[in-house]
Amino acid sequence: QTHAQHGMKVLLDRLEINPADVQLWPCPGIDEVPKVRSGRARLLRDALLPASAVDTWRQLPPPPDEALEGLRRVDCPGPDEEAGVIALMLREVLESEGKSAALVTPDRKLARRVAAEMNRWGIEIDDTAGVPLAQTPPGSFLKLAVDLVAGGFAPLQFLAIGKHPLTAAGRPVAAFRRFVRELEMSVLRGPRPAPGIDGLLAGLQDETRHLKPVLLDLEVMAAGLSELLNRPSVSLIELVGAHISFAEALAASEDMPGPARLWAGEAGEAAAGFISELLDSAASLGDLSGASYGSLFDVLMTGRAVRPRYGGHPRLAIWGLLEARLQHAELIILGGL
C-alpha cells in the first residue's frame, strides 16, 4: 500500500481494466526524463522480491558494476550507532552548498533518534510521519492524568505526572517541583502508602505537614473524574469532560491558566483536535464502565500524529516509504532495514 501507484492499481482493478490497456498521456518533453539505469533497477527489483520468491536469490547472477556505483553499506551494532552514523552522513551533506539528503525509513524510533542527534548540532529536521501524539508533552500529560486518578494516586503514577513539565497545580512550576521532591523523599519511597490522597496524607510527618494543602487541592481537582471512574456505567462525554477539567486544573500555573499551557503549540493543537473529535463521536459509542476509560483513551490516541507545519531544514528530510517514491535528493539513506 505504500507504493506510489497502489491507488491507481486499485482503481484499475475495480474498473476491470488491464494496466497494459492504459494509453500514455501525450506530454511534450517526456522523452527528456533521465532513464533509470537498468542494472540498478534490476538490483532493486531483485532485492524487493516478496518473501515467497527469495529462494531465487541463490540463482541470481552477481549485479553489474553500474548497479553498485555510488552505493555504500554500513553495518551498525545497534540502533544508537545507526542513528549516529546516519546523522553524521546528513551533517556532512550540509558542507556541500546546495546538496540535499534524505533518510528513508519505516522505523519511526530510528527517525526520532536521528532527529535527536541532529538537534545536538542545532539542526531541525522534519519527519514527514510526525511524532505520535502520545509521545508529545500534551498527549503524555493527558494519558498520565487519567492514569493517576485510576491508579489511586499510586507512587509510580504520581511521580510520572508530578515530574511532567506541564504539571503545576496552580502554583509556580519551581515550587511544585520542590513539593514533588519532598513528597517523594518522605512518603513515596519505602512502604507503599494506602490508595488515594488519604494514604499520602497518612504518610506525612510533622516536618512535612506543609505539603498537606497541595495534596488537598489535588484531591479537589480529581474528585469529579475519580467519581466517574468508579461508576459501573457512565457516558463517554461525561468522562472526557471530567478528564479535561482535571487536566486543565493540573496544568495551570501561578501566572498562566491551564488551557493556555496544555493546548499551546502544534502538539497542543493536535491534542485539542483529538479531544474535539472524541467528543463529537462520544454519543455514538454509548455508555461504558468507568474503569475501562483509561484503556479506551490510550487506544483511541494510538495512531494520531503531530506533523510539523514548518521549521525544518530546507535541504534535509526524513521520509516514509510513500514520500520517498515521490521525491528526490542527492543523497538517499535507507535506514532501519
Question: Whereabouts are the PLM-identified features?
Answer:
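Polyanion-engaging groove/track-forming segments
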Residues: 1-337
